[in-house]
């Protein structure tokens, strides 16, 4: 099992965000997290990705207890195992597309030729190789989202976490992005976890997990 969450709870002061969450996710699965605003979808993604810590509970990735990792070992683990796609892109406006993609490997000690090769390979897969020398003011919203996906893939992660990845896109580009994530999960055996309210996203997910009132209330298989 790629991801195991055991009795995971998160509280802010006296407010319970979620409690005693138990969940297993396999490689190659697309998992959709749904729920009302403030239900804990983004918080759960952030905890899996190491941006926040749970109040209680355990997280295992590839049978490794990741909450026990410290310092450099912890940073290296998250950098290599997990790629993020954020709602607001978080791309550097002064850098070229190729440089934005390569930012994910800043601390990987890769040679420049290896970095260039990886960027070109990923960009070709995502059909953005023709814009690698462009600045961000020259790309569309759909292309910007593909750049984010390319950056998330740069370190060859086992997991991609996507927080509302289609919110800033028109319906056509939104569906194209989800199709790409679906294909990546299948072909690369990457677990893709998406938080979204979109019914369209649900149609591409293997599992739909609803978070409500601090708990997982429904887990349904859709494929």
Report the location of each language-model feature.
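Conserved ABC ATPase "signature" region
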Residues: 65, 102, 113-131, 179
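Short coil-to-helix segment of the ABC ATPase nucleotide-binding domain corresponding to the Q-loop/switch region
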Residues: 95-104
